[in-house]
A protein has these predicted regions:
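Short capping micro-motif at the N-terminus of alpha-helices
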Residues: 33, 44-46, 140-142
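Conserved N-terminal/central alpha/beta ligand/cofactor-binding core
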Residues: 1-13, 131, 138, 175
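Glycine-rich loop(s) and the adjacent beta-strand/alpha-helix scaffold that form part
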Residues: 9, 37-114, 118
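An anion/pyrophosphate-binding glycine-rich loop and adjacent beta-alpha core
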Residues: 88-90, 97-191
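Short, glycine-/Ser/Thr-/acidic-enriched flexible segments
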Residues: 21, 38-40, 49, 56-58, ...
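Short, acidic, Ser/Thr-enriched surface-loop or helix-capping motifs
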Residues: 25, 36, 133
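A conserved short coil-to-beta-strand element within the FAD-binding core of flavoproteins
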Residues: 16-30
Length: 191
């Protein structure tokens, strides 16, 4: 959006399909990056600093185990395939301060019978549905934000948990990519 527009207007060099491989450090300061461009490693210098938009580590099992609540598996994420944390690890080795590594965007997902993940950003807040733990106990307010719901799942030790919905919910609301008024037979047979 605006950041790209402003950068282009200012004549800043924008490179796509050019992942950062490493940082160039001179006298304790980051002065550029080593990037892969066109199959070759190239050095790109910086005169005023390096701005990193490194993403997270949703697809890095070791970092999930080190920093996040458990249980946690990379198979549970729909984050982009490049969300692996290498650049974060690189800057941490240089002594960069970090904060909030135990946090995540807790978008609620369910495993579909075909193995795919269904994403549920807003479905839990709809009427005629509750979320329960393995004992059938309700442990969260389904109308809270998906971030709070994710935190509540871990606070309650409710991994895994289940969404229980009645026919009124199915008649009015989608569930992931499944439209209302249609409940696949395999949902019933698979539990």
């Amino acid at each position: 959006g605006w950041m790209l527009f402003t950068a282009l207007r200012a004549g800043i060099d924008i490179r796509t399909d050019c992942p950062t491989v490493d940082l160039v450090v001179e006298e304790g300061k980051v002065t550029g990056v080593i990037a892969r461009q066109g199959g070759k490693e190239v050095r790109i210098g910086a005169t005023k600093g390096v701005l990193l938009n490194a993403g997270g580590f949703a697809r890095n099992a070791e970092m999930r185990k080190q920093f996040g609540p458990q249980p946690s598996f990379t198979e549970w994420t729909v984050a982009n395939p490049g969300d692996t944390g290498e650049m974060l690890q690189t800057v941490m080795k240089l002594g960069a301060a970090t904060h909030g590594l135990d946090r995540a965007i807790w978008t609620i997902a369910s495993r579909q019978p075909n193995g795919n993940l269904g994403i549920h950003a807003n479905e839990l807040a709809k009427p005629h549905l509750i979320v329960v733990d393995k004992h059938g106990k309700r442990f969260t307010n389904e109308s809270c934000s998906y971030m709070e719901t994710g935190q509540n799942i871990y606070k309650a030790g409710a991994v895994p948990c289940w969404a229980i919905m009645d026919s009124r919910h199915r008649a009015k609301y989608a569930w992931a990519l499944t439209p209302p008024r249609y409940t696949p037979a395999e949902w019933i047979t698979s539990g």
